[in-house]
């Protein structure tokens, strides 16, 4: 059994390792509210496209 088969072989059904950004597959800084499942960097990029507006 090689190293490649051992790496990331543990099942991830819950927790931070089981979720990723739908745009870039990043696992850090994930915004899950309202079912967005998008990281904070991608949210800043796509916020207007999604329908969020910046208030003054």
UniProtKB/Swiss-Prot annotation:
Binds 1 zinc ion per subunit. The keyword 4Fe-4S does not apply. Its main location: cytoplasm. Keywords: Cytoplasm, Endoplasmic reticulum, Metal-binding, Ribonucleoprotein, Ribosomal protein, Zinc. Zn(2+) binds at residues 21, 24, 39, 42. The keyword Ribonucleoprotein applies. GO terms for cellular component: cytosolic ribosome; cytosolic small ribosomal subunit; ribosome; rough endoplasmic reticulum. One of its GO terms (biological process) is cytoplasmic translation. It is found in: Cytoplasm, Cytosol; Cytoplasm; Rough endoplasmic reticulum. GO terms for molecular function: structural constituent of ribosome; zinc ion binding. Transmembrane segments: none annotated. It comes from the Eukaryota. InterPro entries: Ribosomal_uS14, Ribosomal_uS14_CS, RIbosomal_uS14_euk_arc, Ribosomal_uS14_sf. Its cofactor is Zn(2+). It holds the Pfam family Ribosomal_S14. Component of the 40S small ribosomal subunit. PANTHER family: 40S RIBOSOMAL PROTEIN S29. Belongs to the universal ribosomal protein uS14 family. This is Small ribosomal subunit protein uS14. It comes from Drosophila melanogaster. The gene is RpS29.
